[in-house]
Design a protein with these regions (language model features):
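Acidic, two-metal ion nucleic-acid-processing modules in DNA metabolism proteins
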Residues: 36
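Conserved acid/base catalytic micro-environments in cytosolic active-site loops
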Residues: 1-7, 13-24, 28, 39-40, ...
């Protein structure tokens, strides 16, 4: 089996060496070259023909944000994984890079000289993402799949049927590819959609608040980062904050449904985890629950969808052709839990159809 060819782009020679050493220790990977900035990387691409590129954001001459669109114009199917920092600026730059076409990101340790932490991040996160992204042939993924956040024109919200909404909650789980998939879905749902929406997007702290703000700018619905005790309202979308599990609880006094956050142990190596949210949704809403599983690595959401299905609820999944990685939705589909398997551009219409079905 051919090794996965990786191009490492970073202006720090120390970073290039550490990334190269850790990746090269994996028998399935081969670092075919390195570059100190985007300009050099673009010059090397035709000769090196990598299967995936890792890209730092802050570099001289041509930084990561300048590099991504150049790469995607000529190599639309080359996955780019950004190296980011856990700062507001890092989050902002990373979300911009994802909107421009980067496939995913990993965050660098914040402590100076944390070489050991960096090696752990590379071995535990980056290698898995490289393998997942390069195994995704994605034959139907268009070169413009990342237009949603920065598209030329806003998406047109769909019309609702005249019948009442049957679903009482829509719960969405998503990971890799989510920053471009969620705007596509939420941007097509109208402001008078008849159920609250709760979202788990695998993201670290700092990122989720900024991401929710961006989603709020492309959707007629009100999108916010959820906070503990918040009451669910129609016309609103609640994004789980990074570093916290989100579940739903019914207020014993008012009967309102509220957000409950905790920092219990990660599930599926994730916090927030879709499984945690989905289990609480199954318990509270039963057959009135609709779960939506979008693009993402791993199997988070599978057990939660089993609970929702067992309670009489409905599961919708994104199809393989339009998923950046068909891990999460694929697990649900392969388990026979999905009532509908739809391309990304039809997910919002599918949500409306199921939510308003009688």
């Amino acid at each position: 089996m051919d090794k996965i060819r990786v191009l490492v782009v970073d202006d720090s020679s120390t970073m290039r060496r550490i990334i190269t050493d850790v990746l090269s220790a994996d028998p399935e990977l081969e670092v075919v070259g390195t570059a100190a900035n985007g300009r050099i990387a673009l010059e090397k691409l035709p000769e090196l023909k990598p299967d995936v590129m890792t890209l730092d954001i802050e570099m001289p001459e041509m930084d990561g944000l300048q590099t991504v669109p150049h790469v995607k114009r000529s190599y639309s199917r080359l996955p780019i994984i950004m190296f980011s920092s856990l700062t507001e600026q890092g989050a902002s730059h990373t979300l911009q890079a994802l909107a421009l076409g980067a496939a995913d990101y990993v965050t660098k340790p914040t402590a100076q000289g944390a070489a050991g932490d960096l090696k752990s991040t590379i071995s535990e996160e980056l290698i898995g993402k490289i393998k997942a992204l390069t195994r995704s042939s994605r034959p139907g993924l268009s070169t413009s799949a990342s237009h949603s956040v920065k598209g030329a024109a806003p998406l047109q919200a769909l019309a609702l049927p005249s019948t009442p909404c049957v679903a009482q909650i829509v719960a969405i789980g998503v990971s890799t590819g989510g920053p471009n998939a969620l705007p596509e879905v939420l941007g097509r749902l109208p402001r008078d959609f008849g159920a609250p929406i709760v979202v788990v997007q695998h993201m670290p702290p700092t990122f989720t608040k900024m991401f929710a703000d961006r989603l709020n700018g492309v959707s007629e619905l009100t999108v916010c980062e959820a906070h503990d005790g918040q009451e669910l309202q129609l016309g609103s979308v609640y994004v789980a904050p990074g570093g916290y599990h989100m579940s739903l609880k019914r207020d014993a006094v008012t009967n309102a449904v509220r957000v409950a956050l905790n920092q219990d142990a990660p599930e599926n190596s994730c916090r927030p985890a879709a499984d945690v949210l989905f289990r609480s949704v199954a318990e509270l809403y039963g057959e009135r629950a609709l779960a939506v599983v979008l693009t993402g690595m791993g199997q988070d959401g599978l057990r939660g969808c089993q609970a929702i299905s067992a309670a009489g609820g409905t599961v919708l999944a994104q199809d393989q052709a339009t998923s950046v990685v068909w891990g999460m939705p694929g697990a649900v589909v392969n388990a026979g839990l999905a009532r509908a398997v739809l391309p990304l551009e039809k997910v919002a219409a599918g949500v409306i159809e199921i939510a308003y079905a009688h």
